[in-house]
Every structure is written in C-alpha cells, then in structure tokens.
C-alpha cells in the first residue's frame, strides 16, 4: 500500500524517525538486543538521555537451535513498562534472521510497538511487510536493491502512523496528513529518486525467488 511507504534516505534515518517520534519518558522501557547495529541503537540512546526512558539490552544466542530460543529472549525481557521493541531483521554480526513476525505478535498482545532495522535483509529475499506484522520497517536501497546511495524506504503500518512525527518540516507540513509528510524535504535530489525506481524495476525483473536462491 503506497499510503504505508515513505521514501527516505537510508535505514538510519528511519530508525531516527521512530526514536524521535514515540513519546516515552521515565519509567518506560525500550528493548534493544545485543546484536543490534549501532545505527539502530544510537538514536534510542540519544533520546533516552533526553527523555529518561530505560534501554533494556538482552543477549541473543550466537548459534540458536531454533527461533523459539530467540523469541524466549524477547519474552523474558518484556515487562509492564515495555513500550517499544527495536530489532534488526537480519544481524550484521553473524547473519541471523530474527523472527520478526513472532516477536511482533507477542509484542502487540501487550500493546508494544515493534520497529525493524532491515538494512541487511531488504532485497535479499521476498518480504511481505503485512505478514511480518511489525509497526515500522526501515531499509536502505543501495545495499541489496542496488539503488543510488541516499535512497531508502520506510514502512509504517496504517494504524501505527499516528505515533510518527516528521524529522524535517517544510511548507507542505500543515496541509498533508498522509505518510508523505515524512518525506517532505522540499528540494530533493531527483536523480536518486529515479534511480531507486529503476532499481526496483530491475529487482522485479530478476525476481525475489531467484535472488533468494543465490
């Protein structure tokens, strides 16, 4: 759904967008496991210092025997104060693919938002964002989609968009309440946008199944 996708610059911007937006304060907790990428961790650390919420850092197994082992780590880390789980889809440390869908289902049963850093997975295999059930999903285009650098995508589930606030505002801010408000940079580098479109066309030409098989 195009009303759930905004064009951003990279994954880091998307994770900053979420950390900047969600109203948290003293007593609230955000879960960030120990395999998170620094670019997805630092935004939360920054806002934790300003707003006073707590960051919980559970340790994931290096060689898990099943996805249930990973899910259990998140389950044990959740408390009545947990408001957000921020997690990578695929780790840059050992290549683990984390069970985003199962963690999201568990989180939503307790009104916890889930933000996903997809820098290492977007473009590597077929992904159904609705099926993952996460609230937010940020990815860069230049890694496995082969777009120009400086292009990324940000997914926000429709019923979770109410939590988001633009990182940058300009003259269209007050007349646009759609997800477009998150990409309202005024002047943009249009060749990058065109390059992203061409990269998506090329990706679709090859097909997700062939890329995943490799």
Q: What do these predicted ranges mean?
A:
Residues 1-214:
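Pyridoxal 5′-phosphate
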